[in-house]
UniProtKB/Swiss-Prot annotation:
<dbReference type="InterPro" id="IPR011607">
    <property type="entry name" value="MGS-like_dom"/>
</dbReference>
<dbReference type="GO" id="GO:0004643">
    <property type="term" value="F:phosphoribosylaminoimidazolecarboxamide formyltransferase activity"/>
</dbReference>
<dbReference type="InterPro" id="IPR024051">
    <property type="entry name" value="AICAR_Tfase_dup_dom_sf"/>
</dbReference>
<comment type="similarity">
    <text>Belongs to the PurH family.</text>
</comment>
<dbReference type="InterPro" id="IPR016193">
    <property type="entry name" value="Cytidine_deaminase-like"/>
</dbReference>
<dbReference type="GO" id="GO:0006189">
    <property type="term" value="P:'de novo' IMP biosynthetic process"/>
</dbReference>
<dbReference type="GO" id="GO:0005829">
    <property type="term" value="C:cytosol"/>
</dbReference>
<keyword id="KW-0378">Hydrolase</keyword>
<comment type="pathway">
    <text>Purine metabolism; IMP biosynthesis via de novo pathway; IMP from 5-formamido-1-(5-phospho-D-ribosyl)imidazole-4-carboxamide: step 1/1.</text>
</comment>
<comment type="pathway">
    <text>Purine metabolism; IMP biosynthesis via de novo pathway; 5-formamido-1-(5-phospho-D-ribosyl)imidazole-4-carboxamide from 5-amino-1-(5-phospho-D-ribosyl)imidazole-4-carboxamide (10-formyl THF route): step 1/1.</text>
</comment>
<protein>
    <recommendedName>
        <fullName>Bifunctional purine biosynthesis protein PurH</fullName>
        <ecNumber>2.1.2.3</ecNumber>
        <ecNumber>3.5.4.10</ecNumber>
    </recommendedName>
</protein>
<keyword id="KW-0658">Purine biosynthesis</keyword>
<keyword id="KW-0511">Multifunctional enzyme</keyword>
<dbReference type="InterPro" id="IPR036914">
    <property type="entry name" value="MGS-like_dom_sf"/>
</dbReference>
<dbReference type="Pfam" id="PF02142">
    <property type="entry name" value="MGS"/>
</dbReference>
<feature type="domain" description="MGS-like">
    <location>
        <begin position="1"/>
        <end position="144"/>
    </location>
</feature>
<dbReference type="InterPro" id="IPR002695">
    <property type="entry name" value="PurH-like"/>
</dbReference>
Amino acid sequence: MKKRALISVFDKEGVLDFAKFLVSKDVEIVSTGGTYKYLKENGLNVIEINEVTDFPEMLDGRVKTLHPLVHAGILAIRDNEEHMNTLKGRNIHTIDYVVVNLYPFFEKVKEDLEFEEKVEFIDIGGPTMLRAAAKNFQDVVVISDKNDYKVVMEEIEANGETSYKTKKKLAGKVFNLMSAYDGAISNFLLADEEEEYPEYLSVSYKKMQSLRYGENSHQTAAVYASTMLDGAMNTFETLNGKELSYNNFKDVDIAWKCANEFDEPACCALKHNTPCGVAIGKDSYEAYMKAYEVDPTSIFGGIIGFNRKVDKKTAEEMVKIFLEVIAAPEYDEDALEVLKTKKNLRVLKFHNTPKADKYMVTVDGAMLVQEEDNKLVEEIKVVTEKKPTDEEMKDLLFGMKVVKYVKSNAIVVAHNGIALGIGGGQVNRIWPTEDALKRGKGATILASDAYFPFGDVAETAAKAGIKAIIQPGGSIRDQESIDVCNKYGISMVFTGYRHFKH
């Protein structure tokens, strides 16, 4: 009995050459719908699926391969005498190759289509064939990825068959794909349900690339892109430089998010996932120069994020020092020419502002899921005798936008749209306060990611010349800090929202 391949693909790249190869090895081709037509038009002798099933395609193509004569041929165990006798008694031909790729649900779910249109891209027959073939991988070669045509052809050419190891790997790839595919469909159908956190968490990501290493050189790593969301970090373009490292991905994410907190032109300079210079200005150049001048030491080897176009003048300043990555929504052509003189400088063009509404992190044996910290303040409540001026209030909100991105315990001191001092990652609140104030000469406001447990932060800030403070409030000793502020004649406002970052 001749071997037989069932081929039904949406993405037809490479399938003609693969089908021709199988025919050259005396394999019969069975196919469906558009794939049948495509192969036939290109001169191949192809058996249409309804010749096998003696049943026409129906329901606008929803039912094509869902038939016992197809699935028995896939699932029969070749060295099981009872199975093979059953096939023989019912004149069912075995299927030895299943080549299927799916309707493009991953792509279509992100397009501006009606709900019902997206539903039509949920593939049923394809996954059913793939799963059946993958279960019986000892006897059936299953291909769900066009990139695997080559290895299968090479093995058949060299050995006359596909190795057990390869068949097992191809089967594993099927179930890997199916879990992502089903997860994407589940998330799509449950997206508007009131239950924010379903009983089972289905995440659907596809590998963007392997990374040279992880956080450290002895750790392996890869980066995966969401199949459901076109966010900032899976749609950017690399205009210059090497591929991003693991640490680059994490740092760029924070630099881009921080810069996009602001309506005004903004720049965020960042090292080791921590802002070292943040400023707003009338344009990207002014914002960059302000951020740079605050700490020209720490910015060296850093990541720079902008929320506006980068011009030549700004580029000329940046190439004066060593930087790892520049991220911006747009670049002037002459700015790009300047930046490209640094061949290893990674220059990224971003097409999307931050979009994610959930944040996930793994712990040993579990995953934590929470809302992104996208809410800055609940309500501005002045709690001191003195009220902040309009200019101070602008700086207070500026400082709170920055402190969101600093590891807790975190303090930012600022003036005139410049983060002059940033202190973070400490186990008490007074140490980051002292760090920020030491660096932040001339600062007039102080922002804290969480409440003051004692009055010492307010005392230290007031003695250093701070005129206004912004913090969430909520300590049982809030009054102690309020009294200190009133004593020194400075203002303090509560926001109601804490911004811990771990």
